[in-house]
From Swiss-Prot:
RuBisCO catalyzes two reactions: the carboxylation of D-ribulose 1,5-bisphosphate, the primary event in carbon dioxide fixation, as well as the oxidative fragmentation of the pentose substrate. Both reactions occur simultaneously and in competition at the same active site. Although the small subunit is not catalytic it is essential for maximal activity. The basic functional RuBisCO is composed of a large chain homodimer in a 'head-to-tail' conformation. In form I RuBisCO this homodimer is arranged in a barrel-like tetramer with the small subunits forming a tetrameric 'cap' on each end of the 'barrel'. This is Ribulose bisphosphate carboxylase small subunit, chloroplastic 6. It is found in: Plastid, Chloroplast. It comes from Acetabularia peniculus.
Length: 182
């Protein structure tokens, strides 16, 4: 088995050492070969400026109310506890400036950022409309803040998921998917 794995590794490294040929687009009986176009798209460069992401679904355009509702239904169907959190634009991203330190000791929170909780976690919530009502109330109270919905699993005692439900209108750190690569 080790010999088989070694031979596969050698073969794949030989294939990778070949120079990259320019893409070819061929038309055969009215059909266009798009594999070259796909390969070119895969080789694009990630835009590093004003292209920040948040947790789950960050690569997608902002979610609509209907899409958020479906996610909330999924959260409730799995008996997870939804919770809303919000943060100002300058405190929303992970970084040392947002990390709470006490001398040489730093917080051990997973991504060095704390968001303020909107009310309490929604224990016992059974209806997605309750969560959507709270999202609207939080958005009305803090229109220039990032608002995310996180959910917790009481059995495993961990955060299961988190995603943005509101991005401030003044945010300039987001790019549409078509503009994320150079």
């Amino acid at each position: 088995m080790a010999a088989t794995m070694m031979s596969k590794t050698i073969i794949s490294s030989k294939q990778c050492s070949k120079p990259i040929a320019p893409p070819k687009v061929s038309i055969n009986k009215g059909f266009v070969n798009t594999s070259a176009a796909i390969k070119n798209r895969e080789m694009m460069v990630w835009q590093p400026f004003n292209n920040k992401m948040f947790e789950t679904f960050s690569y997608l355009p902002p979610l609509t109310d209907e899409q958020i509702s479906k996610q909330v239904d999924y959260i409730l169907a799995n008996a997870w506890t939804p919770c809303l959190e919000f943060a100002a634009s300058d405190q929303a991203y992970a970084g040392n400036e947002n990390c709470i330190t006490m001398g040489p000791v730093a917080s051990t929170y997973q991504d060095n950022r704390y968001w303020t909780m909107w009310k309490l976690p929604m224990f016992g919530c059974t209806d997605g409309s309750q969560v959507l009502t709270e999202i609207q109330a939080c958005t009305k109270a803090f229109p220039d803040a990032y608002i995310r919905l996180v959910c917790f699993d009481a059995n495993r005692q961990v955060q299961i998921s988190g995603f943005l439900v509101h991005r401030p209108p003044s945010a300039t750190d987001y790019r549409l998917p078509a503009d994320r690569q150079v």
